[in-house]
């Protein structure tokens, strides 16, 4: 019998991330490298660890192998616990056959037995594909104080981007009065961050109700939350004012990496009070050659720099040979950049080999970002 837990987190990490093109051809979106040494999922798992959430179910589906290997037993995030800790929850076969996760609500519904063993009071539902730092314990306190059935973390987005998100319309007390999924003409710019806290009894009841509805797409935003509102349940919006980035496109992933290089970034990776943990690559120290030049860049272990690197993010094991320039770019693990290469405003995928004399930069629109990755 598992030990009772006040709050259990369920981390949705099965997304394909098709807008990231070749970067997710053989890799789940939460496993995509970010920030020179991390994977995207590191931020959510580190938030759980730093918030005192010690029981985390990770729901995987698309290209799960590398993600499973990376997570392991959760020791990198201090989540390798005897009671609770990290549990990877892929779809599984029953007597009726394999049940794939058909939506966010479907994924949680199929793992109600996992949740039930902990008899939680609250369930925290998270997405594994956003970049942010957040104390979930403060959101839980807010949820309890407001006596909510469900609390939804929201952030103000630019009005011209609001139609890309699930939008909350609230009253003065921040109680949600209407939820619109990607509205054409939004009446609010409070966007859902895909972070929910449910009272366990409410979650179980409404997921079972949703599963019985043959017309449902089994999605929290499209189906479950509107149903809760229709039935008069209390949904509270929890305002978040820190850094938050949906890195669902090549350009947004590049932008988030570039944000780390600002003199005053709101995403501080050097915050000793809120560390972002990752799996140690166990590479040797970086080597910067005598004639090399490095400015405003993040250079991870195992890199050999003989050329020039400016305002860029280089992951472990990257080689930049003599005469080459890397500017405003992200170079992922193990990439080899030959001699006299120019790379500007680009993402270079893992293990890519860039031949001598190659020039990579946007051809038409200078604001574009070039992706060079296997399968592109």
Curated annotation (Swiss-Prot):
Keyword annotations of the record: ATP-binding, Carbohydrate metabolism, Glycogen biosynthesis, Glycogen metabolism, Nucleotide-binding, Nucleotidyltransferase, Transferase
EC number: 2.7.7.27
A Pfam entry, by short name: Hexapep_GlmU
Reactions the enzyme catalyzes: alpha-D-glucose 1-phosphate + ATP + H(+) = ADP-alpha-D-glucose + diphosphate
GO process terms (BP): glycogen biosynthetic process
Coiled coil: none
Pathway(s) annotated for this protein in UniProt: Glycan biosynthesis; glycogen biosynthesis
Binding-site positions, alpha-D-glucose 1-phosphate: 101, 166, 181-182, 192
Xref: PANTHER family: GLUCOSE-1-PHOSPHATE ADENYLYLTRANSFERASE, GLUCOSE-1-PHOSPHATE ADENYLYLTRANSFERASE-RELATED
Assembly notes: Homotetramer.
Name of the protein described by the UniProt record: Glucose-1-phosphate adenylyltransferase
Native species: Bacillus mycoides (strain KBAB4)
